[in-house]
Swiss-Prot record:
Domain of life: Bacteria
Keyword rRNA-binding included in the entry's annotation: yes
Assigned protein family: Belongs to the universal ribosomal protein uL2 family.
Protein name per the record: Large ribosomal subunit protein uL2
Organism annotation: Corynebacterium kroppenstedtii (strain DSM 44385 / JCM 11950 / CIP 105744 / CCUG 35717)
Taxon lineage: Bacteria, Bacillati, Actinomycetota, Actinomycetes, Mycobacteriales
Length: 280
């Protein structure tokens, strides 16, 4: 995917870049696979803000994505189109199954229009094919990996992400995650061969605040510029730095937001590298 840069005709356009959309083959989605998507503005049923920095944005329709693919084992499908999806960073591929059904999947890198893909334990090791981890050779690059058998893909679904299958150990497969974490996953879980396409999406420069508003992202205001009634860092004379360790608006220390005792933590072989230990 190429990145298209604008001429600097305005201050916002000077910094902007957009996707070239070279991979896409159709601009209109499959109507039968669309569902309405209602905006919440980050509010719950009582109208209280539960997620900050959400609201507005362009109207969207949700594309139904098949994250399981386990009920189509042995049924080949032809890639009819590669399409844009406003609800995710990756592109999506429209499959026409030979039994007449149509479904969307996450579009892997180098998946072309007209390619035939399939799912099942006996599927070939080919980009776009979906099969259990125990049937995939060690060293293969995969994406859209399940955490529980039949639970649907949960891992490596965003643009450019991938997981490497390092080996197999009893009833588990050993995976290297995009975060560099190494963990065990039930070998009956399914994965799709290849890495997610649209990898250059990370290099897009939004250029101006308005483009983020189109996406439904509202501004993030720093606590130190608020009043004391609004944030623990607020108040002070002049540009004060807060005078305490960083906390949330409700006084919780920043960082360490992950639950420390998840049941699946016992399957982690090696923790992810912290930022200070990552190679530059």
């Amino acid at each position: 995917m190429a990145i298209r840069k604008y001429k600097p005709t305005t201050p916002g356009r000077r910094q902007s870049s957009v996707s070239g959309f070279d991979e896409l083959t159709r601009s209109t989605p499959e109507k039968s696979l669309l569902r309405p998507l209602h905006k919440t503005g980050g509010r719950n049923v009582h109208g209280h803000i539960t997620t900050r920095h959400k609201g507005g944005g362009h109207k969207r329709q949700y594309r139904l994505i098949d994250f399981r693919r386990n009920d189509k084992d042995g049924v080949p499908a032809k890639v009819a189109h590669i399409e844009y999806d406003p609800n995710r960073t990756a592109n999506i591929a429209l499959l026409h199954y030979f039994d007449g059904e149509k479904r969307y999947i996450i579009a892997p890198r180098n998946l072309k229009q007209g390619t035939v893909v399939e799912s099942g334990a006996n599927a070939d090791i080919k980009v776009g094919n979906n099969l259990p981890l125990r049937n995939i050779p060690t060293g293969t690059t995969i994406h859209a990996v399940e955490l529980k058998p039949g639970g649907g893909a949960k891992l490596a679904r965003s643009a450019g992400s991938s997981i490497q299958l390092l080996g197999k150990e009893g009833k588990y497969a050993i995976l290297r995650m995009p975060s560099t974490e190494i963990r065990r996953v039930d070998a009956r879980c399914r994965a799709t061969v290849g890495e997610v396409g649209n990898a250059d999406q990370i290099n897009i420069r939004w250029g101006k605040a308005g483009r983020m508003r189109w996406k439904g992202v509202r501004p993030t205001v720093r606590g130190v510029v608020m009043n004391p009634v609004d944030h623990p860092h607020g108040g002070g004379e002049g540009k004060s730095s807060g005078g305490r360790h960083p906390v949330s608006p409700w006084g919780q220390p920043e960082g360490r937001t992950r639950k420390p005792n998840r049941p699946s933590d016992g399957l982690i072989v090696r923790r992810r590298r912290s930022n200070k230990n990552k190679k530059r």
